Amino acid sequence: MRRVRVGDEVIVTAGRSKGKQGKILRILGDERVIVQDVNMVKRHTRPNPTANKPGGIIEREASIHISNVMLYNPATEKGDRIGFRRLEDGRKVRYFKSNDEIIDV
């Protein structure tokens, strides 16, 4: 079970986009994530008439290392550490370490 999942609201803790928050769009391998509207880069693309794609400068999200994001806790309005816990019915769930609130229901 991962500490962060696709769709989680995260806050960036290091790098050029420090302090920004957004949803996780994709997880690449074990170490990198793509966060919505964070770490934007400009990609210069050549037109491809066979694929009917125009050329130009496209702005899109680049990946950042998973250690540079923290799950956003709406109760404290900050990034928070995550722990794992087993419930009485045997399910393994994530919880915020600051206020013991369960994330996965």
Swiss-Prot record:
InterPro entries: KOW, Rib_uL2_dom2, Ribosomal_uL24, Ribosomal_uL24_KOW, Translation_prot_SH3-like_sf. The keyword S-adenosyl-L-methionine does not apply. Part of the 50S ribosomal subunit. NCBIfam families: rplX_bact. HAMAP family: Ribosomal_uL24_B. GO terms for biological process: translation. GO terms for molecular function: rRNA binding; structural constituent of ribosome. One of two assembly initiator proteins, it binds directly to the 5'-end of the 23S rRNA, where it nucleates assembly of the 50S subunit. One of the proteins that surrounds the polypeptide exit tunnel on the outside of the subunit. Pfam families: KOW, ribosomal_L24. Keywords: Ribonucleoprotein, Ribosomal protein, RNA-binding, rRNA-binding. CDD domains: KOW_RPL26 (cd06089). Belongs to the universal ribosomal protein uL24 family. This is Large ribosomal subunit protein uL24. GO terms for cellular component: ribonucleoprotein complex; ribosome.
